[in-house]
């Protein structure tokens, strides 16, 4: 065997981990909105209808979850990051007597769409979490997975807003979020700025709950920051 070929191959393998994080992960591009806008949870609205998102229908371990197609779209302004979830479902599992004016802790015990966003690529275990339910309930948390036990600070408040609606005839629900960027990122928003992110859903009634994610975590815990993809601010 040619020794130079062996050395060259070894160098290539050693350099692979030095590739940028975004080259090895899924990417969602958040498109630049002309201005901030009111939430409608309507994918046909002017601010959303031309936006290309990402689609997933896979479980935590990458297996297909039929009849639960999930599309995530994103746009941004210098002040806010917007997310829109389009969620196909078979059945709804909703909290009785929902509150849309106060935070609902443990909202994940019912149907939700979730966004986990981290901005420190040197501290991937610190990130923030945002949830919206089909009822329009919400909860946001500051997460730090470094301590034992991990810190899930539900008292942290981003000031984000949500809007949701259910199309029962077509078995699709829609959830929108408007998140103040300055609350989770110290950097100035600009085209090309990247964040670490993953998106999730919990849907249906136990014991038949469905767990859908954009980037599969390959275990039973959504709090797996190593699996996050990239959210990139686009034009």
Range-by-range predicted roles:
Residues 1-25:
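Bacterial Sec-dependent N-terminal signal peptides
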Residues 23-235:
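Structural preference for beta-rich elements and adjacent junctions enriched in aromatics
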């Amino acid at each position: 065997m040619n020794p130079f070929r062996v050395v060259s191959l070894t160098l290539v393998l050693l350099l692979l981990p030095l590739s940028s994080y975004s080259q090895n992960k899924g990417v969602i591009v958040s498109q630049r909105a002309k201005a901030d806008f009111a939430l409608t949870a309507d994918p046909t609205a002017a601010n959303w209808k031309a936006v290309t998102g990402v689609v997933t229908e896979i479980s935590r371990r990458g297996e297909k979850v039929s009849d639960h197609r999930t599309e995530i779209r994103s746009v941004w302004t210098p002040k806010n990051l917007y997310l829109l979830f389009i969620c196909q479902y078979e059945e709804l599992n909703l909290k009785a007597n929902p509150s849309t004016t106060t935070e609902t802790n443990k909202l994940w015990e019912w149907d939700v769409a979730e966004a986990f966003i981290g901005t420190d690529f040197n501290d991937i275990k610190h990130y923030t979490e945002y949830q919206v339910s089909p009822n329009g309930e919400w909860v946001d948390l500051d997460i730090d997975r470094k301590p034992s036990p991990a810190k899930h600070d539900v008292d942290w408040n981003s000031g984000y807003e949500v809007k949701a609606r259910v199309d029962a005839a077509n078995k699709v629900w829609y959830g929108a979020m408007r998140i103040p960027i300055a609350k989770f990122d110290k950097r100035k928003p600009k085209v090309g700025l990247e964040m670490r992110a993953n998106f999730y859903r919990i849907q249906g009634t136990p014991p038949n709950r469905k767990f859908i994610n954009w980037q599969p975590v390959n275990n039973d815990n959504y709090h797996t920051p190593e699996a996050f993809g990239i959210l990139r601010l686009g034009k």
